Regions:
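Short, acidic, Ser/Thr-enriched surface-loop or helix-capping motifs
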Residues: 3-4
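C-terminal accessory region of radical SAM enzymes
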Residues: 8-10, 14-64
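Phenylalanine-focused residue identity feature
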Residues: 9, 14, 78, 105-106
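Sparse recognition of residues in long alpha-helices and their boundaries
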Residues: 22-23, 73, 100
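Short C-terminal domain-edge/linker segments immediately following a structured domain
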Residues: 31-34, 41-43, 85-89, 96-99
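Cysteine-cluster motifs in flexible loop/terminal segments that predominantly coordinate metals
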Residues: 48-97
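Iron-sulfur (Fe-S) cluster-binding modules
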Residues: 93-108
Length: 108
């Protein structure tokens, strides 16, 4: 949970949307409990909703990528984090994926 300069609670301190109240109207504990029960937060916590590389990554349960960055750059909160350069093991072992990456890397 993040608290902005004007006292708004947000699900992430970097995300402009998803306001869940303000310190003037709501205690932090109440905001936290409401966030834990919100449909969006429950969907975000279910790692099976995460797409792309982050969705198949062996570290998804402890990382999952930055959802705010994913939404900012891709328009989709559940897409892979574009700033992560890690290639999950399942993709490193996929010859088709490796060939696509080679083609992208060396295209002229």
């Amino acid at each position: 949970i993040g608290i902005t300069e004007n006292g708004d609670y947000r699900s992430c301190g970097f995300h402009e949307g998803y306001r869940i109240g303000n310190v003037k109207d709501k205690k932090l504990r109440t905001a936290w409990e409401e966030l834990q029960k919100s449909p969006l937060h429950l969907k975000l916590r279910d790692k099976s909703n995460i797409k792309g590389r982050c969705g198949v990554c062996e570290y998804s349960e402890i990382c999952g990528g930055c959802r705010t960055r994913a939404e900012y750059y891709t328009g989709d909160l559940f897409e892979s984090d574009p700033a992560c350069n890690y290639i999950p093991k399942v993709l490193r072992e996929d010859p088709k994926y490796l060939e696509r990456m080679r083609e992208e890397l060396y295209k002229k």
